[in-house]
Amino acid sequence: KGQYYFYDDVKNVRKNFFISYKGALFEGEKYLGTTDDAFEVVSIFVWVHDAMSLQGLTKEDFLYLEKEILMNYPKAKINWKNPIEQLMKEN
């Protein structure tokens, strides 16, 4: 419980990825688009399966998850769905 795990089939854009982090399960949906010279994942929507599992997580936790996602998808813009979106917009 509470461990970090990233499950993803990077070769299949149609398959969502899953992240288990500090007891919360997140899912990410990948969208293919064009960059300057290739077709790549350019947008990712991430949401949590159970909002109650977010208790105790901080903005720093979500910034860490963004960094981890960007290691696989460096060209992607990460969009969090609510309630995480609200936290990330503040400040």
Where are these predicted regions, by residue range?
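N-terminal topogenic membrane-targeting module
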Residues: 1-38
